[in-house]
């Protein structure tokens, strides 16, 4: 019997997840289908009950349901609980179990382009929203010891840092202070929507002098190269856009559902082609 997987969100028509997962199922010879489900916020509880009743094997969760879905699940993974959001649900032994692969996926994508273990690197995160929280918690879980957070509202960054119970050296900075100190960091990670299409000339921070060999990463992938990444490249940085994070979080969800890891590069090239790259 064909297994059914999917993604729920609103809007959902733009989602690249069905393309990516259905290709992986076919490539690995798995008899399954992945479908995009448009779910209105007020219908989320009913949708989750329906997915469970129909025996859907697993789902991804996207905007605006990542937080709201948690109250409808049977169990939540500790890291997802700490992040405060779920993006992947596994239907296991009659229970719906929630996970968050956004942050872990990002960490794996970052490690893939780093020549050294991430725990040896000093990092700066820009932003303090949901994406930043997922990445921050996952970096801490991966053993990174120095992670500062810069945000327009410094108090929000302080609250995020205070929520972590792990031993990690973190400071909350203004964007102005972060701009002055950017040369001190091995990795700069842009987690906001600043610079996303159509506001492609915007940047959260002016890039100046960077540490030699610095990695500069932006979770945005539309455009492929934000002004932030463009300026970082001109300053000699190794740059990474948001496609890697998107692909790795999807691949981790796929592995949780099937026990098989899909071809990461195949997934990435498929997404790039679809986006016109």
Curated annotation (Swiss-Prot):
Q: Which GO terms describe its cellular component?
A: cytosol
GO molecular function annotations of the record: NADP binding; shikimate 3-dehydrogenase (NADP+) activity
Pathway the protein contributes to: Metabolic intermediate biosynthesis; chorismate biosynthesis; chorismate from D-erythrose 4-phosphate and phosphoenolpyruvate: step 4/7
Binding annotation for shikimate? 15-17, 62, 87, 102, 221
The organism's place on the tree of life at top rank: Bacteria
List this protein's GO terms for biological process.
amino acid biosynthetic process; aromatic amino acid family biosynthetic process; chorismate biosynthetic process; shikimate metabolic process
Task: Tell me which UniProt keywords the record has, alphabetically.
Answer: Amino-acid biosynthesis, Aromatic amino acid biosynthesis, NADP, Oxidoreductase
Q: Which residues are catalytic?
A: 66 (proton acceptor)
For binding NADP(+), which residues are annotated in this chain's numbering? 127-131, 219, 242
Task: Please tell me whether the keyword Lipid biosynthesis is annotated for this protein.
Answer: no
What's its EC? 1.1.1.25
InterPro entries of this UniProt entry? Aminoacid_DH-like_N_sf (IPR046346), NAD(P)-bd_dom_sf (IPR036291), SDH_C (IPR041121), Shikimate_DH (IPR011342), Shikimate_DH-bd_N (IPR013708), Shikimate_DH_fam (IPR022893), Shikm_DH/Glu-tRNA_Rdtase (IPR006151)
Query: Which reaction equations make up its catalytic activity?
Result: shikimate + NADP(+) = 3-dehydroshikimate + NADPH + H(+)
Family annotation (SUPFAM superfamilies): Aminoacid dehydrogenase-like, N-terminal domain (SSF53223), NAD(P)-binding Rossmann-fold domains (SSF51735)
The broad enzyme category this protein falls into is oxidoreductase
Relate the assembly described in the record. Homodimer.
Q: Which HAMAP family match?
A: Shikimate_DH_AroE (MF_00222)
NCBIfam families cross-referenced by the UniProt entry? aroE (TIGR00507), PRK00258.3-3 (NF001319)
* Summary of the function given for this chain in its UniProt record: Involved in the biosynthesis of the chorismate, which leads to the biosynthesis of aromatic amino acids. Catalyzes the reversible NADPH linked reduction of 3-dehydroshikimate (DHSA) to yield shikimate (SA).
Family the UniProt entry places it in: Belongs to the shikimate dehydrogenase family.
Q: What is this protein called?
A: Shikimate dehydrogenase (NADP(+))
């Amino acid at each position: 019997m064909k297994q059914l997987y999917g993604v729920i969100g609103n809007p959902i028509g733009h989602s690249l997840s069905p393309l990516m997962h259905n290709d992986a199922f076919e490539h690995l010879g798995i008899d399954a289908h992945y479908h995009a489900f448009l779910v209105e916020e007020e219908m989320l509880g009913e949708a989750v009950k329906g997915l469970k009743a129909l025996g859907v094997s697993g789902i991804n969760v996207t905007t605006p349901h990542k937080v709201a879905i948690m109250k409808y699940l049977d169990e939540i993974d500790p890291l997802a609980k700490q992040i405060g959001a779920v993006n992947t649900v596994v239907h296991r032994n009659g229970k719906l179990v929630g996970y968050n692969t956004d942050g872990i996926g990002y960490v794996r994508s970052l490690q893939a382009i780093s020549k050294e273990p991430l725990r040896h690197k000093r990092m700066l995160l820009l932003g303090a929203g949901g994406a930043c929280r997922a990445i921050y918690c996952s970096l801490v879980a991966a053993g990174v010891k120095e992670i500062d957070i810069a945000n327009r509202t410094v108090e929000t960054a302080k609250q995020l840092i205070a929520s972590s119970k792990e031993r990690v050296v973190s400071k909350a900075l203004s964007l102005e202070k972060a701009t002055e100190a950017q040369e001190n960091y091995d990795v700069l990670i842009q987690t906001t929507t600043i610079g996303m299409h159509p506001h492609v000339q915007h940047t959260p921070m002016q890039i100046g002098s960077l540490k030699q060999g610095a990695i500069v990463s932006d979770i945005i992938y539309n455009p492929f190269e934000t002004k932030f990444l463009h300026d970082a490249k001109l300053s000699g940085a190794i740059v990474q856009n948001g496609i890697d994070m998107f692909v790795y979080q999807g691949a981790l969800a796929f592995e949780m559902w099937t026990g098989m890891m899909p071809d990461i590069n195949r997934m990435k090239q498929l997404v790039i082609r679809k986006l016109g790259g």
